[in-house]
Curated annotation (Swiss-Prot):
Recorded superkingdom: Bacteria
Protein name in the entry: Multidrug resistance protein MdtH
PANTHER family xref list: MULTIDRUG RESISTANCE PROTEIN MDTH (PTHR23517:SF2), RESISTANCE PROTEIN MDTM, PUTATIVE-RELATED-RELATED (PTHR23517)
Xref: PROSITE patterns: MFS
Organism: Cronobacter sakazakii (strain ATCC BAA-894) (Enterobacter sakazakii)
Alphabetic keyword roster: Cell inner membrane, Cell membrane, Membrane, Transmembrane, Transmembrane helix, Transport
Family to which this protein belongs: Belongs to the major facilitator superfamily. DHA1 family. MdtH (TC 2.A.1.2.21) subfamily.
Gene Ontology terms: cellular component: plasma membrane
Transmembrane spans: 13-33, 34-54, 99-116, 139-159, 165-185, 214-234, 243-263, 277-297, 300-320, 340-360, 368-388
Main location: membrane
Subcellular location: Cell inner membrane
Keyword field contains Cell membrane: yes
Membrane topology label: Multi-pass membrane protein
GO molecular function: transmembrane transporter activity
Length: 402
């Protein structure tokens, strides 16, 4: 095996271990935030939605800067610093008894993600060959699902004793992850050239096709982020106990572990990336619309199953399509900017979703927020269809697979 092939192989194992630690640390804490502050402490869903939206907006909205700096400095210092900041955010959340403290903790957590997320994504693009990326992203998603349910189980168990324990374990996992990267991650550069900060950002902003695609994904993410806000609250409301939330993540884990990889292998040979993304988005959209009418856990979990299946179809295609459109001369900048749709979608999805959820309760129309998400999903589908229609694209782009 050549030294390059060996580095790629070892690098992929490193990425998988690192990803598991990050996912565990995140899901120990974040799925329980809405349960802790909305249901246990009685805060308005809007207050918690603002906190979650701030984390999303800071982490993903500033991602282009984190990516551009990583293009200049390399991956390791950015990743280690970011993970320590995330740990500090969780430690602050443990003592949050007023909204501004929760908001501050989420901003710190988001700043940490701004530093470590783009270089980690760029490392995947660097270390995984283009023809293997779709399957590798599927493996990461399977790992995300297993880590999510494991983290949620740990967090739910700890929540019985004290929310501070939940935050402490999450912070500890990110400190361990920072040490893992500081010790084992080589001093790799992310881009094929040492790109100055301004040049890398400028290269992305001049790429009109990429910018349009990323901003369109705002609507997709407004739907996707509800697994952290409205879906857990709905499960808790119908079940009457926070422990039921773990079954929501168990459903995701089972579906992902059984369907994600084989579905990705099957669909990549038969459908283009944008077709898979749009099909998954439609399934997600039409599974969310009836949730406001669900009256028991069986109905709710059936709709959540359909939502996760849509995500399983869409997410590997979205990641692979984003990577395929990135310029190798500024990988970090591109991967950072690719998170901007998640920044806007997360902020609007959390804050807007929280406001609509409160309004639906006040007006005794619980279907209101879900109907609005349906409108957003259909609008996003039409925008993607317009961008990727045959007449608008240069020959060969639709056939491009990463």
């Amino acid at each position: 095996m050549s030294s390059v092939s060996q580095a790629r192989s070892l690098g992929k194992y490193f990425l998988l271990i690192d990803n598991m630690l990050v996912v565990l640390g995140f899901f120990v804490v974040f799925p329980l935030i809405s349960i802790r502050f909305v249901d246990s402490l009685g805060w308005a869903a809007l207050m918690v939605g603002i906190a979650l939206g701030l984390r999303q907006l800071v982490q993903q909205g500033l991602g282009i800067f984190g990516g551009a700096i990583a293009d200049r400095l390399g991956a390791r210092p950015m990743i280690v610093t970011g993970m320590l900041l995330r740990a500090a955010g969780f430690a602050t959340m443990a003592v949050a008894h007023e909204p501004w403290v929760l908001w501050l903790s989420c901003v710190l957590s988001g700043l940490g993600g701004t530093l470590f997320d783009p270089p980690r994504s760029a490392l995947v693009v660097k270390l995984v060959r283009p023809q293997e990326r779709g399957r590798f992203f599927s493996l990461l998603m399977m790992q995300d699902s297993a880590g999510a349910v494991t983290g949620a189980l740990i967090g739910s168990w700890l929540l019985q004793y004290d929310f501070r324990l939940v935050c402490g374990v999450g912070a500890l996992l990110f400190v361990l992850c920072a040490g893992f990267n500081a010790w084992l991650l080589p001093d790799w550069k992310l881009s094929t050239v040492r790109t100055p900060l301004r040049e890398g950002m400028g290269r992305v902003l001049r790429d009109r096709r990429f910018v349009t695609y990323v901003l369109t994904l705002t609507g997709y993410y407004m739907l996707a982020v509800q697994v952290m806000l409205m879906l857990p609250v709905m499960v808790n409301d119908i079940a009457g106990e926070p422990a039921a939330v773990k079954w929501m993540y168990a459903i995701e884990a089972v579906l992902s572990l059984t369907l994600l990889y084989p579905l990705a292998r099957w669909s990549e040979k038969r459908f283009r990336l944008e077709q898979r993304l749009m099909a998954g988005l439609l399934v997600m959209t039409f599974s969310l619309v009836p949730i406001g009418l669900a009256s028991n856990l069986q109905q709710l979990f059936t709709l959540i199953c359909l939502f996760y299946i849509g995500s399983i179809i869409a997410e590997p295609a979205r990641e692979t399509l984003s990577a395929s459109l990135a310029d190798a001369r500024a990988r970090g900048s591109y991967m950072g900017f690719s998170r901007l749709g998640l920044a806007f979608g997360g902020a609007l999805g959390y804050a807007g979703g929280g406001w609509l959820f409160d309004a639906g309760r006040a007006l005794h129309t619980p279907e209101l927020p879900w109907a609005m998400l349906g409108v957003i999903g259909v609008g996003t589908f039409l925008m993607l269809w317009w961008q990727f229609s045959q007449k608008r694209l240069a020959p060969g782009l639709l056939e491009q697979e990463s």
